[in-house]
Protein backbone atom coordinates (compact mmCIF):
# COMPACT_ATOMS: atom_id res chain seq x y z
CA UNK A 1 0.00 0.00 0.00
CA UNK A 2 1.02 3.59 -0.56
CA UNK A 3 0.83 4.93 2.94
CA UNK A 4 3.11 7.94 3.22
CA UNK A 5 2.37 9.55 6.57
CA UNK A 6 -1.10 8.06 6.73
CA UNK A 7 -1.77 6.13 9.93
CA UNK A 8 -5.55 6.06 9.73
CA UNK A 9 -6.99 4.06 12.61
CA UNK A 10 -10.29 3.02 14.09
CA UNK A 11 -11.45 5.72 16.49
CA UNK A 12 -10.23 8.56 14.29
CA UNK A 13 -12.29 11.00 12.25
CA UNK A 14 -12.86 9.71 8.72
CA UNK A 15 -11.20 11.93 6.09
CA UNK A 16 -13.80 14.00 4.28
CA UNK A 17 -13.77 14.13 0.49
CA UNK A 18 -15.64 15.66 -2.42
CA UNK A 19 -15.90 13.69 -5.65
CA UNK A 20 -18.08 12.92 -8.65
CA UNK A 21 -20.38 9.95 -8.21
CA UNK A 22 -22.92 8.17 -10.37
CA UNK A 23 -26.37 7.63 -8.91
CA UNK A 24 -29.66 7.10 -10.74
CA UNK A 25 -27.74 7.26 -14.03
CA UNK A 26 -26.63 10.82 -13.28
CA UNK A 27 -23.35 12.48 -12.32
CA UNK A 28 -23.48 14.13 -8.91
CA UNK A 29 -20.91 15.77 -6.67
CA UNK A 30 -21.02 14.26 -3.22
CA UNK A 31 -19.10 14.77 0.00
CA UNK A 32 -18.73 12.32 2.83
CA UNK A 33 -19.91 15.13 5.11
CA UNK A 34 -23.21 15.17 3.18
CA UNK A 35 -24.08 12.09 5.22
CA UNK A 36 -23.44 13.46 8.69
CA UNK A 37 -25.93 12.15 11.24
CA UNK A 38 -25.94 8.84 9.36
CA UNK A 39 -23.80 5.75 9.50
CA UNK A 40 -21.80 5.19 6.31
CA UNK A 41 -20.49 1.98 4.79
CA UNK A 42 -17.57 3.22 2.68
CA UNK A 43 -16.09 0.43 0.61
CA UNK A 44 -13.34 0.43 -1.98
CA UNK A 45 -12.98 -2.00 -4.86
CA UNK A 46 -10.20 -2.37 -7.45
CA UNK A 47 -11.72 -1.73 -10.88
CA UNK A 48 -14.88 -1.62 -12.95
CA UNK A 49 -15.61 -4.41 -15.41
CA UNK A 50 -13.80 -7.04 -13.36
CA UNK A 51 -14.90 -10.25 -11.71
CA UNK A 52 -15.18 -10.33 -7.93
CA UNK A 53 -16.16 -6.64 -7.77
CA UNK A 54 -19.65 -6.91 -9.29
CA UNK A 55 -20.56 -9.70 -6.87
CA UNK A 56 -19.78 -7.42 -3.92
CA UNK A 57 -21.33 -4.28 -5.39
CA UNK A 58 -24.62 -5.92 -6.32
CA UNK A 59 -24.76 -7.82 -3.02
CA UNK A 60 -24.61 -4.52 -1.12
CA UNK A 61 -27.32 -3.10 -3.38
CA UNK A 62 -29.56 -6.12 -2.85
CA UNK A 63 -29.27 -5.64 0.93
CA UNK A 64 -29.58 -1.86 0.77
CA UNK A 65 -32.95 -1.73 2.52
CA UNK A 66 -31.52 -3.58 5.52
CA UNK A 67 -28.80 -0.94 5.86
CA UNK A 68 -31.20 1.93 5.18
CA UNK A 69 -33.43 0.79 8.04
CA UNK A 70 -30.40 1.25 10.29
CA UNK A 71 -29.91 4.89 9.19
CA UNK A 72 -26.97 3.87 7.02
CA UNK A 73 -25.79 4.99 3.59
CA UNK A 74 -23.50 2.96 1.34
CA UNK A 75 -20.79 4.42 -0.90
CA UNK A 76 -18.67 2.38 -3.32
CA UNK A 77 -15.36 3.83 -4.50
CA UNK A 78 -12.82 2.90 -7.18
CA UNK A 79 -10.13 4.69 -9.18
CA UNK A 80 -12.23 4.50 -12.35
CA UNK A 81 -13.82 7.56 -13.97
CA UNK A 82 -17.48 8.41 -13.59
CA UNK A 83 -17.89 7.52 -17.28
CA UNK A 84 -16.62 4.01 -16.63
CA UNK A 85 -18.99 3.72 -13.67
CA UNK A 86 -21.91 4.81 -15.83
CA UNK A 87 -21.06 2.35 -18.60
CA UNK A 88 -20.85 -0.48 -16.07
CA UNK A 89 -24.17 0.52 -14.52
CA UNK A 90 -25.73 0.48 -17.97
CA UNK A 91 -24.54 -3.11 -18.49
CA UNK A 92 -26.95 -5.75 -17.19
CA UNK A 93 -25.95 -8.23 -14.51
CA UNK A 94 -26.21 -11.19 -16.86
CA UNK A 95 -23.33 -9.68 -18.85
CA UNK A 96 -21.15 -8.97 -15.81
CA UNK A 97 -22.51 -5.48 -15.30
CA UNK A 98 -24.27 -3.88 -12.36
CA UNK A 99 -27.63 -2.72 -13.64
CA UNK A 100 -29.30 -0.17 -11.38
CA UNK A 101 -27.84 0.25 -7.89
CA UNK A 102 -29.46 1.61 -4.75
CA UNK A 103 -26.42 3.71 -3.79
CA UNK A 104 -23.76 5.90 -5.46
CA UNK A 105 -20.51 4.78 -7.05
CA UNK A 106 -17.78 7.35 -6.44
CA UNK A 107 -15.00 8.15 -8.91
CA UNK A 108 -11.55 8.44 -7.33
CA UNK A 109 -9.70 9.05 -10.60
CA UNK A 110 -6.98 11.11 -8.91
CA UNK A 111 -6.65 8.40 -6.24
CA UNK A 112 -6.82 10.95 -3.46
CA UNK A 113 -9.55 9.15 -1.50
CA UNK A 114 -7.80 5.79 -1.75
CA UNK A 115 -4.59 7.37 -0.48
CA UNK A 116 -6.41 9.16 2.35
CA UNK A 117 -7.87 5.84 3.49
CA UNK A 118 -4.56 4.01 2.98
CA UNK A 119 -5.93 1.38 0.59
CA UNK A 120 -4.09 2.24 -2.64
CA UNK A 121 -1.70 -0.54 -3.62
CA UNK A 122 1.56 -0.25 -5.55
CA UNK A 123 -0.30 -1.11 -8.77
CA UNK A 124 -2.39 2.03 -8.46
CA UNK A 125 -5.73 0.41 -7.60
CA UNK A 126 -7.61 0.25 -4.33
CA UNK A 127 -7.54 -2.87 -2.22
CA UNK A 128 -10.87 -4.09 -0.91
CA UNK A 129 -11.06 -1.71 2.04
CA UNK A 130 -14.26 -1.26 4.01
CA UNK A 131 -14.96 1.32 6.70
CA UNK A 132 -17.98 1.78 8.95
CA UNK A 133 -18.26 5.43 9.93
CA UNK A 134 -20.66 6.57 12.63
CA UNK A 135 -22.87 9.70 12.61
CA UNK A 136 -20.14 11.70 14.33
CA UNK A 137 -17.75 10.89 11.48
CA UNK A 138 -15.67 8.46 13.54
CA UNK A 139 -14.34 5.25 11.99
CA UNK A 140 -15.70 2.41 14.11
CA UNK A 141 -14.59 -0.51 11.96
CA UNK A 142 -12.18 -1.15 9.11
CA UNK A 143 -11.03 -4.15 7.15
CA UNK A 144 -8.90 -4.59 4.04
CA UNK A 145 -8.92 -7.64 1.78
CA UNK A 146 -6.45 -8.47 -0.96
CA UNK A 147 -7.72 -8.35 -4.52
CA UNK A 148 -8.63 -11.97 -5.11
CA UNK A 149 -11.49 -12.53 -2.64
CA UNK A 150 -14.63 -10.67 -1.74
CA UNK A 151 -16.20 -9.47 1.47
CA UNK A 152 -19.28 -10.63 3.34
CA UNK A 153 -22.21 -8.25 3.21
CA UNK A 154 -23.90 -10.22 6.00
CA UNK A 155 -20.87 -9.78 8.26
CA UNK A 156 -20.77 -6.06 7.49
CA UNK A 157 -24.42 -5.81 8.52
CA UNK A 158 -23.77 -7.81 11.71
CA UNK A 159 -20.87 -5.57 12.71
CA UNK A 160 -22.95 -2.46 12.01
CA UNK A 161 -25.69 -3.81 14.27
CA UNK A 162 -23.15 -4.50 17.01
CA UNK A 163 -21.70 -0.99 16.71
CA UNK A 164 -25.14 0.54 16.99
CA UNK A 165 -26.03 -1.66 19.94
CA UNK A 166 -23.01 -0.76 22.05
CA UNK A 167 -23.37 2.92 21.20
CA UNK A 168 -26.96 2.77 22.44
CA UNK A 169 -25.95 0.66 25.48
CA UNK A 170 -22.57 2.02 26.63
CA UNK A 171 -22.46 -0.28 29.68
CA UNK A 172 -22.51 -3.41 27.53
CA UNK A 173 -20.19 -5.10 25.02
CA UNK A 174 -20.92 -7.64 22.29
CA UNK A 175 -19.09 -10.99 22.39
CA UNK A 176 -17.88 -12.95 19.37
CA UNK A 177 -20.48 -13.74 16.71
CA UNK A 178 -23.07 -11.57 18.45
CA UNK A 179 -26.30 -10.96 16.56
CA UNK A 180 -29.34 -8.89 17.55
CA UNK A 181 -31.25 -10.77 20.23
CA UNK A 182 -28.18 -12.54 21.59
CA UNK A 183 -26.91 -11.95 25.11
CA UNK A 184 -24.38 -9.21 25.69
CA UNK A 185 -21.79 -8.83 28.42
CA UNK A 186 -21.02 -6.28 31.10
CA UNK A 187 -17.31 -5.38 30.87
CA UNK A 188 -16.73 -5.86 34.57
CA UNK A 189 -14.61 -8.61 36.22
CA UNK A 190 -17.48 -9.69 38.47
CA UNK A 191 -20.59 -8.92 36.39
CA UNK A 192 -19.12 -10.59 33.31
CA UNK A 193 -19.21 -13.91 35.18
CA UNK A 194 -22.97 -13.97 34.64
CA UNK A 195 -22.36 -14.19 30.90
CA UNK A 196 -19.67 -16.84 31.14
CA UNK A 197 -21.67 -18.93 33.60
CA UNK A 198 -24.55 -19.14 31.13
CA UNK A 199 -22.40 -19.64 28.04
Curated annotation (Swiss-Prot):
Keyword presence, ATP-binding: no
Modification comment: The Cys-53-SH group is the primary site of oxidation by H(2)O(2), and the oxidized Cys-53 (probably Cys-SOH) rapidly reacts with Cys-174-SH of the other subunit to form an intermolecular disulfide. This disulfide is subsequently reduced by thioredoxin.
UniProt family annotation: Belongs to the peroxiredoxin family. AhpC/Prx1 subfamily.
One GO cellular component term noted in the UniProt record for this chain: chloroplast
Quaternary structure and interacting proteins, as annotated: Homodimer; disulfide-linked, upon oxidation.
Catalytic residue list: 53
Domain Thioredoxin: 8-165
Keyword Plastid: yes
Reactions that this protein is recorded to catalyse: a hydroperoxide + [thioredoxin]-dithiol = an alcohol + [thioredoxin]-disulfide + H2O
Gene for this chain: ycf42
Other remarks on this protein: The active site is a conserved redox-active cysteine residue, the peroxidatic cysteine (C(P)), which makes the nucleophilic attack on the peroxide substrate. The peroxide oxidizes the C(P)-SH to cysteine sulfenic acid (C(P)-SOH), which then reacts with another cysteine residue, the resolving cysteine (C(R)), to form a disulfide bridge. The disulfide is subsequently reduced by an appropriate electron donor to complete the catalytic cycle. In this typical 2-Cys peroxiredoxin, C(R) is provided by the other dimeric subunit to form an intersubunit disulfide.
Gene3D superfamilies: Glutaredoxin
Keywords: Antioxidant, Chloroplast, Disulfide bond, Oxidoreductase, Peroxidase, Plastid, Redox-active center
Organism: Porphyra purpurea (Red seaweed)
Function in brief: Thiol-specific peroxidase that catalyzes the reduction of hydrogen peroxide and organic hydroperoxides to water and alcohols, respectively. Plays a role in cell protection against oxidative stress by detoxifying peroxides.
Protein name: Putative peroxiredoxin ycf42
InterPro entries hit by this protein: AhpC/TSA, Peroxiredoxin, Peroxiredoxin_AhpC-typ, Peroxiredoxin_C, Thioredoxin-like_sf, Thioredoxin_domain
GO molecular function, a single term: thioredoxin peroxidase activity
BP terms from Gene Ontology: cell redox homeostasis; cellular response to stress; hydrogen peroxide catabolic process; response to oxidative stress
Protein EC: 1.11.1.24
Compartment(s) where it occurs, according to its Swiss-Prot or TrEMBL record: Plastid, Chloroplast
Superkingdom of origin organism: Eukaryota
Amino acid sequence: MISGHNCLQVGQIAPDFSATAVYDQEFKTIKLSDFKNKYVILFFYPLDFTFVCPTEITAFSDKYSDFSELNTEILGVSVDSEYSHLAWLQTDRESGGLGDLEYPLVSDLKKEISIAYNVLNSGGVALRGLFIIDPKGIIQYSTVNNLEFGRSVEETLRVLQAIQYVQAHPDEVCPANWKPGDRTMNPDPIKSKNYFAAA
